[in-house]
Amino acid sequence: MMRNPLSKKITGIEPSGIRKFFDLVSEMPDAISLGVGEPDFDTPWRIREEGIYTLEQGKTFYTSNAGLKDLKIEISKYLERKIHVEYDPDHEIMVTVGGSEGIDVALRAMLDTGDEVLIPQPSYVSYVPCTILADGNPVVIPLQQKIEFKLTAEELEAAITPKTKMLVMPFPNNPTGSIMTKEDLEPIAEVVKRHDLYVLSDEIYSELTYKTEHVSISSLPGMKERTLVINGFSKGFAMTGWRLGYICGPSVIIEQMLKIHQFAIMCAPTNSQYAAIEGLRHCEDEVQQMRNAYNQRRRYLVNEFAKMKLECFEPFGAFYIFPSIKEFGMTSEEFAMRFLEEEKVAVVPGSAFGESGEGFLRVSYAYSLEDLKEAIGRLSRFVERLRSQK
């Protein structure tokens, strides 16, 4: 008999709960998906045009491992302008294959076996499995709806042990749309410094905040040297398929992460890097137009959920809304499956984002207003039917 070819680590990890409903809806005619967190806009034309031009010019070879110098310079300028933090493009910035690679490389570079990583939930599905694959121990901090799923200093303090090394800060948050203001972040930063922790700040939705600007924890006093900032072009610039992100932080950490990136990836896609330079230099207006459209959809959904009397707070980040369905006495997966089967609309059960997401749904508004209105009509009908059956 052949030995088991698979590691215990990988067989113990469940596939993403997000993709399950996306795969199901793709097989249903007339179905609407509000499940995938991907912009419905085309990549801005100037970015695409630059990509075409660089291909025509034959710029199809490897770049340096850490990325094109001009791109890192533009990223440095962008971050100084947006989050008011200066990063040395030569030593403190590494270009990655999407923000997801940055998360993976950061955890693998910083964790020894048994190191604990604090992960507020509900949050993006990759943090826990990537921590496990890096031989770390994920420790979940359940966030509370009553305070808009924000992390508090008291919750953080209670979760810290002598083995704690890192805190993940997933804000603006997927799936809740929650943001952290400067006033929210300051007590968190004090706890982090007092316990000598590092922060992995996933800021991929930083371009998508409404009514208030994004604040990075790295901008607070004493935090740049203990924070790794993850960002990229997928969400704000509508470049999901270009697979381009970056990670910024102390040079002593970036230099070691570069080894993993070197051996596993070599470099991020050359064509995408040239295109992103154009995006950072010239596409701020297009990014603002997309943000305005998301904001219009956000306001529409908040109002519609209020009319349906589905409890949810008003989100000010990303492109998700996170209504409660606890009144119906079923799990979020049961609700989502019935909604899909009966009304042909896909949403993601909150449980896909951790146990504290149970009883909620993630509804993406990265879809046209026409699709949202049709989906809301079907949801209203479904909710009325459930309430009549009580």
Residues covered by each model-derived region:
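PLP-dependent class I/II
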Residues: 3-6, 11-14, 24-28, 32, ...
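Intrinsically disordered, tyrosine-centered linear signaling motifs in cytosolic regions
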Residues: 61-62, 205
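Conserved N-terminal alpha-helix of the aminotransferase class I/II PLP-enzyme fold
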Residues: 62-97
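Conserved nucleotide-sugar phosphate-binding/catalytic loop shared by glycosyltransferases and other
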Residues: 57-59
